[in-house]
């Protein structure tokens, strides 16, 4: 499956009606080359990997693309509809609640794509990169907060 921005816009409209009751506003889309992320959401923009190289494949299959794209749309939903722009905990309770709702109603399981499915296929360098990012995002601010409180 070859990805284009037009295809992303078309799928956004389709999935918006199917999973979000047409609540989401159209956002911007970008395709990018990456080694370990399949998708990413930044304020008002959904980034999708051109090819899922980390999964050992060169092309997307339909189910994997749908799970990844709807996953990023849930981030867009939490940010725009719920008004919560959480960068520290992007997969917090609002994200998980909407994801479980979609899984319960439609059987679409997006929670298994949060670094779980692909982690085993990464190189040691990529795994260290992920852990370094986690340390910067979660552990350092948490330790700072604890030292500031106590």
Roles of regions detected by a PLM:
Residues 1-63, 80-150:
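Metalloprotease/metallohydrolase-associated module, dominated by Zn2+-dependent proteases
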Residues 67-80:
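Active-site recognition of the HExxH zinc-binding catalytic motif
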């Amino acid at each position: 499956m070859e990805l284009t921005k037009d295809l992303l816009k078309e799928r956004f409209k389709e999935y918006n009606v199917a999973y979000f009751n047409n609540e989401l506003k159209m956002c911007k889309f970008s395709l990018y080359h990456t080694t370990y992320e399949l998708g990413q959401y930044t304020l008002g923009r959904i980034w999708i990997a051109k090819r899922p190289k980390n999964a050992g494949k060169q092309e997307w299959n339909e189910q994997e693309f749908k799970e990844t794209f709807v996953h990023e749309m849930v981030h867009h939903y939490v940010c725009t509809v719920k008004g919560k722009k959480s960068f520290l905990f992007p997969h917090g309770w609002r994200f998980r609640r909407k994801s479980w709702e979609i899984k319960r109603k439609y059987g679409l399981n997006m929670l298994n794509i949060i670094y779980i499915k692909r982690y085993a296929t990464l190189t040691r360098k990529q795994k260290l990169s992920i852990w370094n990012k986690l340390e910067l995002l979660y552990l350092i601010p948490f330790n700072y907060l604890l030292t500031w409180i106590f």
